Regions:
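Active-site metal-binding motif and surrounding structural segment of the metallo-beta-lactamase
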Residues: 38-87, 173-175
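Active-site environment of divalent metal-dependent phosphoester hydrolases
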Residues: 62-65, 123, 140-142, 162-166, ...
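Metallo-beta-lactamase
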Residues: 84-87, 91-143
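Cap/insert and terminal regions of metallo-dependent hydrolase folds
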Residues: 162-199
């Protein structure tokens, strides 16, 4: 299993740095965990976006899904012609939120580009040789951490979360922990994020 961090900026992209987006590859399987602002450009440096096997979105904040709109265009206007719908896994209601920002025609095109699967906390999904487990964490509404398993390797991507039992449970046994550390230590406890010390 190979992890490529495509973006780790908080809320908005910094100069030269995209928002949340992480590529996990194993064999011929390529899974994108979150697809925030600027991620698609960075993805294109390491993988043709049309080669993705699936996309997983952690929650309803735009800095974690903004480039899904650009990905839809990449799939629709691929040189080989429109591609089959790409599996898109996300919490209940998030796709509706994403579609609501578009015109009726735009929402229709978005729905055609993706095979939408609304995840329930605890759900286990197989994508090629990878197993992805959706683990509830504490941020806003339904927010999911993703545990990706490949043979004996176990990666935990916490997504945005406060420190608590939920994220500890998700991270237990991880070979690699990719953790939210948005808040400076001086702001610990002021928002549903972890500090570097907590992470």
């Amino acid at each position: 299993m190979q992890l490529t961090i495509l973006g780790s900026a908080a809320s908005y992209p910094d100069a030269g740095r995209a928002c949340a987006g992480h590529l996990v590859r194993s064999g011929g399987t390529s899974v994108l965990l979150d697809c925030g602002n600027g991620v698609l450009s960075n993805l294109g440096r390491v993988l043709d976006p049309t080669a993705l096997s699936a996309v997983f979105i952690s929650h309803s904040h735009v800095d974690h899904f903004a480039d899904v709109y650009a990905l839809e265009a990449a799939l629709r206007y691929a040189p080989a012609g429109p591609l089959p719908p790409l599996p898109l896994y996300l919490p209940t209601g998030v796709f509706e939120l994403m579609s609501g920002a578009l015109t009726e025609h735009g929402a229709s095109e978005l729905a055609e580009a993706f095979e939408v699967h609304e995840l329930t906390p605890g759900e286990v999904v197989r994508v090629g040789g990878l197993t992805v487990i959706a683990c509830p964490v504490e941020h806003v509404g339904v927010t999911l951490a993703f545990v990706v398993e490949d043979g004996g390797a176990r990666l935990c991507y916490t997504a945005d979360t406060r420190l608590g039992d939920a994220v500890r449970d998700a991270a237990r046994g991880a070979s690699v922990l990719l953790a939210d550390a948005t808040l400076p230590q001086a702001f610990a406890g002021r928002a549903p994020h972890m500090t570097p010390v907590e992470a």
